Structure formats: C-alpha cells, structure tokens
Amino acid sequence: MAAALPLQPSTTASATTTATAVALGEVEDEGLLASLFRDRFPEAQWREKPDVGRYLRELSGSGLDRLRREPERLAEERAQRLQQTRDLAFANYKTFIRGAECTERIHRLFGDVEASLGRLLDRLPRFQQSCRNFVKEAEEISSSRRMNTLTLNRHTEILEILEIPQLMDTCVRNSYHEEALELAAYVRRLERKYSSIPVIQGIVNEVRQSMQLMLSQLIQQLRTNIQLPACLRVIGYLRRMDVFTEAELRVKFLQARDAWLRSILTAIPNDDPYFHITKTIEACRVHLFDIITQYRAIFSDEDPLLPPAMGEYTVNEGAIFHGWVLQKISQFLQVLETDLYRGIGGRLDSLLGQCMYFGLSFSRVGADFRGQLAPVFQRVAISTFQKAVEEAVEKFQDEMTSYTLISTAAILGSSNTPATVPATQPGTLQPPMVLLDFPPLACFLNNILVAFNDLRLCCPVALAQDVTGTLENALTKVTKTILAFHRAEEAVFSSGEHEIFVQFCTAFLEDLVPYLNRCLQVLFPPAQIAQTLGISPTQLSKHGNLGHVNISAIQEPLAFILPKRETVFCLDEQELGPDLVAPAPELPAEQRSMEPVTEKREPGEPLPQEPMEGEPLPAEPPSEGGAIGSVPCPQPGEQP
C-alpha cells in the first residue's frame, strides 16, 4: 500500500516531475514485488514473462476492495477455464487421441529415418573410398595394359637387356675380359639413363658382382708365374675397370707378385739350412729381378705432366716401389741371418759369394745391397767363433777336473827320446810339439785351431778386435782354471809334481799363447789392419791390442808359480811379437833386449798370409785331433 502512494496525482508538481516520479515508482514496485513474491515466483521467471509483470503491476495499482475480490474472481475464472477445457476435451477426444497417435507414429518414423540416415552417413566414406580404389585400379589396369602392349612390341630388345647379367657371367668365367669390359661400359650407360628402374638396378647389381669376380680373377693371375706380356694385359684390364687409382694399382700389383714370391719361398724345404738359404738366394735373385723388370715395364716413375688439381694431394708413387724393394731385401737378410745362425758347416765362403753375386745383379736395378751383407756375415762369423771358443774353454775345464800330474810324469818319463815331428810345408805354422806332454793344453789348442779354420772362411778385418777380445777372455778363463787347479792340488803336490805343474804353466804361457798370437797375425795381418785404418804400420801400436793378445795380462796371475829368471822376457804390448821363445838359462848377446824377436822384413812389408799348417779352405771343418796342423790330443795316461 505504501508503494502506491507516489501514484497519486499532485497538483503542485510539474509534468516533468510527474514522469520522473512514475518511473521511480515503477522501479520501486518491481523491487517490492520481487521481495514479496520471492518464495513463490522466482524473479527470473516473472521477469521473463511480461504478462506476469504486467498483472502484478496492475494489482499494485488496484484499490483495497478490488484486491479483496481478486482471489474470488480468479477462482471463478479458473473454474470456468477448467470447465471449458473439460467440455472441449469431451467434445474432441477422438481428435486428441488421433493426434496423439499420429504424433507418436510420426515420432517413431522420424527415429527410423534418423537411424537410416546415420547408417547411410557411416557407409558413405567407405563407399567413397571404394570408388576411389576402383578408379585407381582401373587406371592401373589401363596403364598395365599399355605397358604390356609396349613390352610385347619391344620384347626382343628387353630380352637382350635382361640377358646381360648371364652374358656377363659367361664372359668372365671364360676369360673373355675384353667383351666383359664392353658389357660393363654399356651397363654403366644404362644406369646413368634409367637408374630409377628397379630392373635396371638389379641388372647393375648383378653386373657389379661379375665385375668383382673378374677383378679377383685378374689379381689371382698376378699371383701366378705370369710373364711380362700377360702382366701388361692384366694391368690394362685393371686400368679400364677404373677400380683403383694409379697408386693403389701399383700396391695391388706388388702385393700380388709378392704373394707369388712368398709361395715359392715357402715351398723350399727348411730342414737343411744350407740348402734352404741357397735355394732362397736363387729364387729371390731370379724372381725378384723378373718382378722388378715387369714393374718398370708397366709403371713409369716419371713426374706427371699435369700438376694436381686444386684440393688434390699428390702421392709419391716411386716411393711405393722402392719401399717394397727395401722390404724384400730386409726380409731376405733376416732369412739369411736366421739360416746362418742355424749353422751351415764350413761353407760360409761359398754362401758369401752367392750373396755377393745376388747383390751385384741387383745393382743393375739400383738396389745393390752388398754393403748390408758384411754386418750379417760378421755377426754370424763372430758368433760362431765365440761359441766354438766357449766350447773349447768348457772342454778344457772338464779335462782339468780329471787331470792328474802323475799320468803326466809317466808321459814325460817315457818321452826322453825326441818325438818324430811330421814334415811340414814351407811357410806353414807348426804347433808347439811340447804341448803333447800336456793333453788338456793340446786339446784346447786343437779346438781353438778348429775355430780359427772355420773363421778363415769368412774373416773380415773388422772382426780383428772382437776375435782378439774373445780369445783373450778365453785365455783368461783358462788361466783361472789353472789357478783353481793349483789351489786345489797344491797341498798334496810332491816336488816332482810341482816341477811338472811349473812346466805345464810354462808351456801354456811360452808356447801356446805365443802360437795363438802368430795365428792371429795370419788371420789379421798388421799391414792389412793398418791399411784399413788408413795409418802406417808403425802407428798401429797406438790403437791398442788389434790383432794380438795381451800376453802380460795373461801371464800376470801365474807369475808367482813360474820360477824367477835372471833375464825376463817381456813382450812389448805395443808391438806384435810372433812368439815367445822357450826360456833358457842364458840368451845370446844379440837377443838380450826388451824388443821381441821378429823376422827380418823390409819396413812396411806386410806379414805373409800364411795358412795354418795343412789348413787350406776345407769343405768340411777338420775333426778334432785328426786335422793337419793340430796337436794330437792323447788321453791322460796314454803314450804320445
């Protein structure tokens, strides 16, 4: 009711004020209605229906009486509406039923139509794809038909192309290399034009396999005993195949020929070192020379006419061949040294001659390796000599362990009559016969002479110092063995045994050692040593003990055993003395000096190259005790 007050007209307000008040009143009415009917009519519901709002505004503008009658009026109007609706339903119920049935049927039909349309829409993509596939297959069939027609028309040409791999394989296996190379060139042209065609790719792959087989066959031919014309053809085929560069082709050629050479060398029997090395020398000399001749005929070591392109590097192709030749020579020297160390008997000079001839033949191709042979033979010669000397020392030590001075006394007692000395040739070295009274010394000298005889077969001047040092070491060990024997037996020596032992030491120092010194002078003449060093023979003494043994160093440990002499002979260590004469109570006046007794020679005249007695260059080393120039070595207790 309070909200209806502003709706009363005011006589004093103007028209503008009245309109404003009315608008404000409507707003206030809506707010009041919203608060009054909040529980029954939600605000959103009556705001969406204009009739409800209009009716409510109409009620808000009505008087009290009308508002009191409004519920009754609404009830009557409702009853009236219900009666009208009931009458309408009774009058038209068949229509309503028919309409409901039609509506239901229409609703059901629409559902069926909707389901059918859904199934149709689901099948349309598959149908569309099937149509596309049909069109595509039709196009493919059409294209295939056109291709089959074209293939039928070009059947002969296609068959020839398809038979290329079989024809290529036949040519390769029958060694028709020229025809195989022409087929390969034709296939390369096909590949450049039709590389995307699978059939062409298959043909190319099969032809490449045949080319690989042909490459293996050509390289295998180089691994056989092939002659120069065949080598030229094979290398020509390899160059036309364009598989290797020029440097790689040279390496392949040398590898193949090297494999053939190694197969020949491997087939040589290895049981006998001398037979193995002689056959190796012959095979290497003949076949290596052939390989070098073939290489130089096929490949040129001249500089290329055109400079290398930008970004390319040059290969020193000449170094490939020279490196291979050096490798082969190095391998030959290794085999030579191995067989020499295995032992070849007394045929070292013959083997040296063969090797020198081998090196000389290689000088014609610029690969003279004779300078490399000298160190090999020197090492083998000194090693063999050292081994023989060591064995001689060991045998001497073994004999001294069982040596007794009693047997020596019997020998000396029975040798009052002079022994018959065999006739010797002029200019030969006769071993001291006094050593026959002392079997250990005689056998030791025999073994050393056997070592000297073997050394004479190949005795370079460069070994003078090593041979001298080896002999000095051996004599030093012999001296120590004699001293050890003296220390062990001195306590039980009788006066006679002591005298015999003194004679034993005297024979060792004054007969055996000087004789070995003379042998060294025969092996290494002082004049030859001086000429090698580029000095005069008089200056040779400044270079130490070259070619002679230091007798003083060997004599010094035994000095306390030897009796003191009134005149002591001293070998000047700076001169080469051929011998120490046997001690005598007195010397002739002309020999009472400190100078060694030497033969009369002109100044600068070399010592004669005298062979040891009865020792020419033998094919086999002389046997111990039976060689000419050796002292017979009796057993202890045996009569000489």
UniProtKB/Swiss-Prot annotation:
Topology in membrane: Peripheral membrane protein
Checking PANTHER family in the record gives:
CONSERVED OLIGOMERIC GOLGI COMPLEX COMPONENT 8, CONSERVED OLIGOMERIC GOLGI COMPLEX SUBUNIT 8
Q: How does it assemble?
A: Component of the conserved oligomeric Golgi complex which is composed of eight different subunits and is required for normal Golgi morphology and localization.
| One Pfam family matching this protein | Dor1
What InterPro entries does this protein's entry cite?
Answer: COG8, COG8_Metazoal_Plant, Cullin_repeat-like_dom_sf
What this protein is reported to do is described as: Required for normal Golgi function.
Stated family: Belongs to the COG8 family.
Return the annotated region ranges for Disordered.
Answer: 580-640
| Organism the protein comes from | Mus musculus (Mouse)
**A Gene Ontology CC term for this entry?**
Golgi membrane
Q: Name one GO biological process term.
A: glycosylation
Under what name is this protein listed? Conserved oligomeric Golgi complex subunit 8
Q: What is its main location?
A: Golgi
Top-rank lineage group of the source organism: Eukaryota
Keywords from the UniProt entry: Golgi apparatus, Membrane, Protein transport, Transport
Where is this protein found?
Golgi apparatus membrane
